[in-house]
Amino acid sequence: MAIPLPLTSCSPISTSSSISRTSFVPLTLRNRTFFSNQNYSRRVLISCSSSLSSDNGSSPDSMNGNGNGNGSSLNGQSSFPRLPSFDGTSKPPLKWRRVLLKVSGEALAGDEEQNIDPKVTMAIAREVAAVTRLGIEVAIVVGGGNIFRGSTWAGCSGLDRSSADYIGMLATVMNAIFLQATMESIGIPTRVQTAFRMSEVAEPYIRRRAIRHLEKGRVVIFAAGTGNPFFTTDTAAALRCAEINAEVVLKATNVDGVFDDDPKRNPNARLLDSLTYQEVTSKDLSVMDMTAITLCQENNIPVVVFNLSEPGNIAKAIKGERVGTLIGGTWNSIVTTTS
């Protein structure tokens, strides 16, 4: 019984001789790469051989291997070209296949006075587009500090911390929708998922659905933090990273990385190349809050802190190139790519 294959292109390129004719049909299978070491645009060549009559008029039996031709045989050698084995898991040689990008609200503001700088969101969109073409799956968590920061407003005018944090979560949704619109304007399929239901504007966060979106090549933006007050969006980034099995948290900020002192106060502050989780906690470095750092440490999730405003930094970080400060890993394990 013939099993239909999901052909999306079929244009035979034929070669012939006095013995056989072979058609090589480029076969495109969705979301599959058929060679372990190189990217062949998800195509595989299938050889469809049929024997022509030879000088003595005999023809092979393709089912039992009888005959004197070069036809296909179940019991002997096949005239089909041998393809590299494929188990469905081969990937191009990139360090990370699925990443979580954390974009702070302050970084989205840029130099604008209207809370969100369209030039910043467009720069993010273009660099994300460049890496998704390589097959890297990208999820994003956005902050809301450019619009409202709950921890700052708590206690003001009778506003309790929980209420202030919920307002901050709504601010992240505003940023997420803006970023989604920017990405889709340049052709990047994007979904926004919120930690609590806002069905008129976004999907609810469902782990399996988020992973499926990523597998289909869509960018997923997680908004509304964890959905609970008293937790930062950095913690939300660490949590979502662990849940969707992403390999790294890439924290895009408005500084070059982690310094041994505040560079605003100390012009001689030194940019740190890499750190362990223990060094971050023992030195009380302002990287992420302790809940986020602990969550990353317990799940062996490395964190890269880098400057969002430097052109090309997002793409470099996503591809695993050396940029900013690496926490919980070693640069030697990072593959530098030039694709």
From Swiss-Prot:
Task: Please state the Enzyme Commission number of this protein.
Answer: 2.7.4.22
Q: List, in alphabetical order, the GO biological process terms annotated in this UniProt record.
A: 'de novo' CTP biosynthetic process; chloroplast organization; chloroplast RNA processing; regulation of photosynthesis, light reaction; response to light stimulus
- Please describe the organ and tissue distribution of this protein's expression: Expressed exclusively in leaves, but not in roots.
Q: According to the UniProt record, where is the region Disordered?
A: 52-89
Q: Which domain of life is it from?
A: Eukaryota
Q: Where is the composition biased (Low complexity)?
A: 52-79
Give the pathway listed in the UniProt entry for this protein: Pyrimidine metabolism; CTP biosynthesis via de novo pathway; UDP from UMP (UMPK route): step 1/1
In this chain, the stretch annotated as Involved in allosteric activation by GTP covers 110-115
Presence of the UniProt keyword Cytoplasm in the record: no
- Which controlled-vocabulary keywords does the entry list? ATP-binding, Chloroplast, Kinase, Nucleotide-binding, Plastid, Pyrimidine biosynthesis, RNA-binding, Transferase, Transit peptide
Q: What did gene disruption experiments reveal?
A: Reduced capacity to grow photoautotrophically associated with low levels of many plastid transcripts (e.g. PSI (PsaA, PsaF), PSII (D1, CP43, CP47), Cytochrome b(6)f (Cytb(6)), ATP synthase (AtpC), LHCs (LHCa3, LHCb2), and NDH (NdhH)) but abnormal accumulation of others, altered plastid translation as well as a strongly affected plastid ultrastructure (e.g. almost absent stromal lamellae and swollen grana stacks) with a large number of plastoglobuli and reduced photosynthetic performance due to strong defects in the major complexes of the thylakoid membrane.
Query: In Gene Ontology terms, what is one molecular function of this protein?
Result: UMP kinase activity
Induction / repression: Induced by light, detected at low levels in etiolated seedlings.
Q: Where is the transit peptide?
A: 1-53
Record's Gene3D superfamilies? Acetylglutamate kinase-like
Q: Which residues form a coiled coil?
A: none
Q: Where in the cell is it found?
A: Plastid, Chloroplast stroma
Q: What's the catalysed reaction?
A: UMP + ATP = UDP + ADP
Entry function = Catalyzes the reversible phosphorylation of UMP to UDP. Required for specific post-transcriptional processes of many plastid transcripts (e.g. PSI (PsaA, PsaF), PSII (D1, CP43, CP47), Cytochrome b(6)f (Cytb(6)), ATP synthase (AtpC), LHCs (LHCa3, LHCb2), and NDH (NdhH)), thus being essential for retaining photosynthetic activity in chloroplasts. Associates with group II introns of the plastid transcripts trnG-UCC, trnV-UAC, petB, petD and ndhA to stabilize corresponding precursor RNAs.
SUBUNIT field: Homomultimer. Homohexamer. Forms RNA-containing megadalton-sized complexes.
Which family is this protein grouped under?
Belongs to the UMP kinase family.
NCBIfam families the record matches = pyrH_bact
- Provide the protein name: Uridylate kinase PUMPKIN, chloroplastic
